[in-house]
């Protein structure tokens, strides 16, 4: 386990839980694109790095208030943050609540922008 994972208490996830930026780009062009949830704060979401056009902004500190609605969402969910640490934490919360179709954008917005 790497240093950041130990610091944040996050164990490596199943490789199927991660979505590469190119895979997300293709899914966004499909007939049934996933719901993108950006867990960064409003300042980051609207800041210079920007956000994915269709993303919903639900900051991680407000995430618990939205779990029931997100668990019930019929489409697949993709979570994103600046790198991928906060989105991985949010995915863990959703999985604990029973949500199975949830992925984390590998590298977050930094991966998306490269």
Regions found by a protein language model. Name each.
Residues 1-49:
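Flexible, polar/low-complexity N-terminal or interdomain linker segments that lie immediately upstream
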Residues 51-53, 98:
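Short, structured coil segments at secondary-structure junctions
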Residues 23-24, 62-67:
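Short acidic active-site motifs
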Residues 32-36, 53-54, 76-77:
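Short active-site oxyanion
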Residues 43, 64, 85:
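Glycine-rich nucleotide phosphate-binding loop and flanking beta-alpha elements
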Residues 47-50, 91-93:
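Short amphipathic alpha-helical segments
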Residues 18, 36, 55-57, 102-104:
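Conserved beta-strand scaffold positions in the cores of enzyme catalytic domains, especially
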Residues 67-113:
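Catalytic cysteine-centered active loop of the rhodanese-like fold, especially the PTP/DSP P-loop
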């Amino acid at each position: 386990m790497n240093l950041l994972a130990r610091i944040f208490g996050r164990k490596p996830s199943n490789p199927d839980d991660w979505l590469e930026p190119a895979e997300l780009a293709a899914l966004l062009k499909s007939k049934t694109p996933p719901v993108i949830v950006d867990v960064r704060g409003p300042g980051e979401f609207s800041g210079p790095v920007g956000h994915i056009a269709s993303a919903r902004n639900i900051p991680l500190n407000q995430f618990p208030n939205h779990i029931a609605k997100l668990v019930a969402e019929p489409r697949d969910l993709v979570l994103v943050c600046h790198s991928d640490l906060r989105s991985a934490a949010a995915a863990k919360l959703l999985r604990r609540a029973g949500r199975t179709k949830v992925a984390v954008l590998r590298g977050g917005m930094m991966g998306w922008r490269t």
